[in-house]
Amino acid sequence: MKKKVLVGMSGGVDSSVAAYLLKEQGYEVIGVTMQIWQDDEEFIEKEGGCCSLSAVADARRVANKIGIPFYVMNFKDAFKRNVIDYFVDEYMEGRTPNPCIACNKFIKFSSFLDKAMAMGIDYVATGHYAIIEKHNDRYIIKKSEDDRKDQTYALYNLTQFQLERTLMPCGQYKKSKIREIAKEIGLRVHNKKDSEEICFIPDNDHGRYIKNRFPNKVREGNFVDKQGNILGTHKGIVYYTIGQRKGLGIAFGKPMYVVDINPFRNEVVLGDLEDLLNTELIAKDINYIPFDTLKDPMEVEAKIRYSQTPSKAIITPIEDGRVRVNFHEKQRAITKGQSVVFYKDDLLIGGGIIEK
C-alpha cells in the first residue's frame, strides 16, 4: 500500500517539483496550500507571496498538471497567533523577530503535521532545501546540495517526531536543476521568481505594517548616543533594527548605526560601527538535532543571520538550558530576537534565540 504524503504547496517552483518528485517516487501525494492570509485587502490582493490568492491558483494549476488532488486548508488563526502576533510583540519589545522560523516551528511542522496525522496521512513534505537522514536511530538534518539556497538555518527547531514524518525531496538538488525539472514537465512556474519578502507584509515595511495596526502603540521617541545625549527624534522603535544605518531620517556628518533599542525608555541608541562588533552572545530556547542535550563545550560553526557564512565558535551550556556562544572573530550586529544556528561541517547541530 502506498504511503500518503501531504505536500505544502506555495505555488512556487520548489514545492511544485517536490510534489512531482514524491509522486514519481511512488507516494500517494495530496497537495495543500495553507490559507494563512488575514481579512486584509493588501494581503489578499498581493501578487506572488508564498500563500497569497495568486499562489493558490498557481498551486492548483500545478496539482492538476501532475495529477494529484489539491485542497486549501485554513490555518489563519494559528498563523495570526503564532507568527503575526509574535512578530508585532517582538518589535514592540525592541527585538527583531524571524517570522519564517516561527512559521516553520508552529505552522508548517506543527499545525500542518497535526492535520496530516489526524487524516491518517504518513508524512508531510515541503520544498525546503535541506536533507533529512536517519543515523543510528536518530534523524539528522544536513545542508542541501545547493549552498546558496540551503534553508537549514530556518529548520533548527524541528523535533525527532517531526523529522520522522517529514520529507524534503528538493534538498538533493541544486535550484537550477529544480527549475529544469519544472520546465521539462511543463510547469508554468518553472521561471517564477523566488519569494523573498515577509509573506504577510507586501512591501517589506514592517514599521508601517505595525503602525497601521497599532497606531496608539507606536510613538515617536529620542535617538540618543551611548551616554544618553539626545541626537534627534525617531518615528517609533518598531521601524529600527540593530545594525541599521539607512532610513534614520537624520544626518550626522558621519555614518551612525543603531546599536541598541530601549523599549522601556522608547529610545533608539546610535553609535559607530565599532559598537556593533562583539564576540559573545547568550541564546535561549535551544533545540538540538543530533542529540537531546549538550553537557560540555563544543566547537561549532555558527551564524547569526540567514545569509551569513558560518563562523567558528564555541558553544557552552549554561543555566536554564541556555548557551553561551563565543566566536573566534568579532561578529557584526548581533541582534536580540534573531536566531543563532550551529553546524559541524554540513551537519545542523541546532540553534536558539539570541537573548543578549
UniProtKB/Swiss-Prot annotation:
- Which Cys pairs does UniProt list as disulfide-bonded? C103-C199
Top-rank taxon: Bacteria
Q: Where is this site: Interaction with tRNA?
A: H128, Q338
Sorted alphabetically, which CDD domains does this protein's record hold?
MnmA_TRMU-like
Q: Give the molecular function GO annotations.
A: ATP binding; tRNA binding; tRNA-uridine 2-sulfurtransferase activity
GO BP: tRNA wobble position uridine thiolation
- At which positions is ATP bound? G8, M9, S10, G11, G12, V13, D14, S15, M34, G127
Q: Which GO terms describe its cellular component?
A: cytoplasm
Entry keyword annotation includes Secreted: no
The UniProt entry, under InterPro entries, shows: MnmA-like, MnmA-like_C, MnmA-like_central, MnmA-like_central_sf, Rossmann-like_a/b/a_fold
Keywords of the record: ATP-binding, Cytoplasm, Disulfide bond, Nucleotide-binding, RNA-binding, Transferase, tRNA processing, tRNA-binding
Q: Where are the transmembrane segments?
A: none
Question: What catalytic reaction does the record list?
Answer: S-sulfanyl-L-cysteinyl-[protein] + uridine(34) in tRNA + AH2 + ATP = 2-thiouridine(34) in tRNA + L-cysteinyl-[protein] + A + AMP + diphosphate + H(+)
* Record EC number: 2.8.1.13
> Which residues act catalytically here?
C103 (nucleophile), C199 (cysteine persulfide intermediate)
List every stretch annotated Interaction with tRNA: 149-151, 305-306
Family per similarity comment: Belongs to the MnmA/TRMU family.
What HAMAP family does the record point to?
Answer: tRNA_thiouridyl_MnmA
**Which NCBIfam families does the protein's record reference?**
PRK00143.1, trmU
Q: What does this protein do?
A: Catalyzes the 2-thiolation of uridine at the wobble position (U34) of tRNA, leading to the formation of s(2)U34.
What this protein is called in its record is: tRNA-specific 2-thiouridylase MnmA 2
Q: Which organism is it from?
A: Clostridium botulinum (strain Okra / Type B1)
Q: Which gene encodes it?
A: mnmA2
